[in-house]
């Protein structure tokens, strides 16, 4: 897909200036760009976003996903001239997105108050570890720390081991997602009132927001959830079970679904057993029930168990690896993974734009730009009227 492809999606009339780096802020920008917004990402000259060199394998590809559909320019935000350039970009934008430590933009003369004086309807999206206020606001914060503080890390892993982590930067993407939600709500508010505002999304609070009923469980019942491995305490059966040739996940914790599972297992009597007949009883006898199911699954192949679960309408599935996703007909039918042409790869595969929209579907028009400052001439020339000579001068002095 060429960079001149026409943007599609519900946000094609929105311009966002992205000042963030790495994951949390840029994930919000990625979602906006996927939905058609004109996202102009500002990177420091000479080095760029550190994510450009992050990744595994022979080539760092994280950048290609995170900065897809974005136009990338350089500006030295530590220099007054660089700040002035960015201020001019923001003056003509709908939104500005940043994920620096709280107070950084203020030190650069880019506070919301200063920017909104020139652009009263401006929406500022601020993503940070701890938020813009409070005693921890000035601390450096990464996803790992936010996941720990927000309570998620304590619940991850086996009960007899130290807390573990998910294999992804969940805190970052959660914060970016909530930031995007806040920004879209702020756009709606601006349409009705003309007012801009600040979105303050922290990593730890984004994690806290998905912690279900852990807070009231403790304050009302003095109950603290603990690590439980592949199961959830008192929710049964919902676990990963051994098969002859692999492992398989079964989630049959609702009463009617559990009855269907018992029929599939050829043991309908279990559904009327007092130990398992009701949700609460199954939770109290979770270990016994998991052992019974595991004894049954280990005598069958993964495909055999899957066929029985499908036949009886029991929610279940294989534990997919990346190759499994690429080979799966459902992924293919819904185009969940697509080929994106690039200069280096004719068919670079990556996850598509989600969610799907029946009227205003977004698309991947290009991947993260290869060259640092690739859109300097286009953006600074078209939007600010700078000439090639102006840009050459700014480049020679490390302003861009």
List each language-model region with its residue ranges.
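Flexible, small-/acidic-enriched active-site or ligand-binding loops
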Residues: 2-3, 7, 345-393
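Short Gly/Pro-enriched turn/cap motifs at secondary-structure boundaries
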Residues: 63, 228-233, 238-239, 345-348, ...
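Glycine-rich beta-alpha junction loops
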Residues: 46, 130-131, 203-208, 215, ...
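A glycine-rich dinucleotide-binding beta-alpha-beta segment and adjacent secondary-structure elements
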Residues: 311-365
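N-terminal helix-loop segment corresponding to the beta1-alpha1 unit
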Residues: 1-182, 186-192, 377-400
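Oxidoreductase and adenylate-handling cofactor-binding alpha/beta cores
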Residues: 176-196, 209-221, 262-269
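Conserved Rossmann-fold dehydrogenase catalytic segment
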Residues: 132, 160-170, 191-207, 226-233, ...
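Aromatic-enriched alpha-helical interface/lid elements that frame and gate functional surfaces
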Residues: 236-312, 316
């Amino acid at each position: 897909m060429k960079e001149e492809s026409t943007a599609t999606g519900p946000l094609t009339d929105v311009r966002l200036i992205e000042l963030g780096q790495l994951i949390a802020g840029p994930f919000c920008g990625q979602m906006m760009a996927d939905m058609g917004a004109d996202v102009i990402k500002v990177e420091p000259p000479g080095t760029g976003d550190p994510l450009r060199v992050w990744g595994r394998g022979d080539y760092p590809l994280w950048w290609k996903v995170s900065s897809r559909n974005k136009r990338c320019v350089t500006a030295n935000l530590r220099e007054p001239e660089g700040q002035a350039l960015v201020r001019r970009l923001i003056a003509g934008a709908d939104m500005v997105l940043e994920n620096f430590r709280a107070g950084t933009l203020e030190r650069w003369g880019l506070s919301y108050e200063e920017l909104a004086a020139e652009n009263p309807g401006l929406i500022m999206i601020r993503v940070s570890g701890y938020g813009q206020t409070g005693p921890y606001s000035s601390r450096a914060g990464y996803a790992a720390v936010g996941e720990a503080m927000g309570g998620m890390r304590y619940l991850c892993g086996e009960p007899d081991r130290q807390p573990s982590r998910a294999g992804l930067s969940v805190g970052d993407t959660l914060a970016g997602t909530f930031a995007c939600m806040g920004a879209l709500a702020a756009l709606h508010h601006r349409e009705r009132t003309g007012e801009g505002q600040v979105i303050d999304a922290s990593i730890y609070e984004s994690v806290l927001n998905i912690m279900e009923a852990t807070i009231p469980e403790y304050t009302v019942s003095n109950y603290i959830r603990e690590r439980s491995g592949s199961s959830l305490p008192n929710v049964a059966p919902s676990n990963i079970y051994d098969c002859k040739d692999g492992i398989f996940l079964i989630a049959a914790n609702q009463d009617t679904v559990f009855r269907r599972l018992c029929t599939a297992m050829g043991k309908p009597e279990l559904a009327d057993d007092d130990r398992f007949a009701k949700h609460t009883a199954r939770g109290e006898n979770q270990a016994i029930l998991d052992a019974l199911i595991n004894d049954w699954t280990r005598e069958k192949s993964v495909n055999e168990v899957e066929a029985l679960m499908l036949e009886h309408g029991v929610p279940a599935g294989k534990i997919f690896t990346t190759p499994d996703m690429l080979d799966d007909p459902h992924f293919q039918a819904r185009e969940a993974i697509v080929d994106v042409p690039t200069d280096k790869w004719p068919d670079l595969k990556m996850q598509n734009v989600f969610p799907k929209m029946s009227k205003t579907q977004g698309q991947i028009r290009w991947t993260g730009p290869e060259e640092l400052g690739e859109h300097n001439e286009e953006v600074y020339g078209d939007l600010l009227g700078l000439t090639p000579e102006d840009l050459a001068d700014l480049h020679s002095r490390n302003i861009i």
